[in-house]
UniProtKB/Swiss-Prot annotation:
Protein name: UPF0325 protein PBPRA2971
Protein family membership: Belongs to the UPF0325 family.
NCBIfam families the UniProt entry points to: PRK13677.1 (NF010213)
Cystine pairs: none
InterPro entries linked: UPF0325
Amino acid sequence: MYPHLTSIGIEQPEAIERYSLRQEAANDILKVYFAKNKGELFAKSVKFKFPRQRKSVLVNSGSREYKEITEINRTLTHIIDELDIITKRKHTEVDIKKKILGDLRHLERVVSHKISEIEADLEKLK
């Protein structure tokens, strides 16, 4: 399902919680964090180093001046796409759970208030 993550040795992509990406010299450093298991103090993480691709870009066509630039490795782009799918899906699930819990708490308050109102009306009848 996640061929690029599998190709770099990640056997359980569903356990990924988040990731970070930074540039260091001529490399991009990808750090993948996994969900913390019960009893662990720190979450497990793995680090990958991807060399940036170098390109010569024409700056001035009149003088035929070129400038060397670097850009993200194509493989890393595919890996990030897969990581985004995994992490966004988890965030969506968490957001839905928060919404449901919020709705439930609101319903509890409404019902509690209504019960108090009915009890007050009953007291008036005595």
